[in-house]
A protein has these predicted regions:
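Structured catalytic cores of enzymes that bind and process phosphorylated ligands/cofactors
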Residues: 1-5, 28-32, 122
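C-terminal substrate-binding subdomain of Rossmann-fold SDR/epimerase-dehydratase oxidoreductases
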Residues: 49-162
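Active-site Tyr-X1-5-Lys
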Residues: 1-22, 44-51
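Flexible, glycine-rich beta-alpha linker
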Residues: 16, 21-40, 63
Length: 162
């Protein structure tokens, strides 16, 4: 809806000094770790609280493009400071399964935890991947790799929130 309003404003008043950024699945330090937040923040909480295993919905095969919140903030700042007025998708450009994400978090936690897949629960969309061609052409590339960003987020949770 916001994009349509901005386009209408452009047509009516000729003003096009705005940018729209459509981020992929964002995660990072200031996420909602209550268990009702994103899949990553909820998984971090589950792993931290687990002693032997965690339950995960579906079979772990859905693919996501996870992007670190700090990289999204940097992209917004670059669009603003470089006066780039456009609409872009912003993602890491890396296809990661839910299973890979959970296994990476377990590795980071250094806890001997197994995953119990509950196939009676839904997988969700099988693939959510953005076309980041325009983002790449502008030179807006995420700085942190997925695993490093997960480490920062996990460390924040255990060292700052608990």
């Amino acid at each position: 809806m916001g994009e349509i309003l901005l386009e209408s404003y452009k047509v009516q008043y000729g003003y096009d000094k705005w940018s729209i950024i459509r981020p992929a699945n964002i995660f990072g330090e200031y996420d909602d770790f209550s268990g009702n937040g994103t899949v990553i923040s909820s998984t971090i909480k589950k792993i931290y609280e687990a002693t032997h295993s965690i339950e995960a919905w579906g079979d772990g095969s859905p693919i996501r493009d996870f992007v670190y919140a700090g990289d999204v903030a940097d992209a917004i700042l670059k669009l603003y400071t470089d006066k780039i007025h456009t609409t872009i998708n912003f993602g890491a450009g890396e296809e990661i399964t839910i299973k890979q994400m959970i296994e990476t978090l377990i590795k980071i936690s250094k806890k001997p935890i197994s995953i119990n897949w509950d196939s009676s629960k839904p997988n969700g969309d099988l693939r959510r991947q953005m076309d980041i061609t325009k983002q790449t052409q502008i030179g807006l590339l995420p700085v942190l790799g997925f695993e490093k960003a997960l480490e920062i987020t996990y460390d924040y949770y255990i060292n700052k929130l608990l």
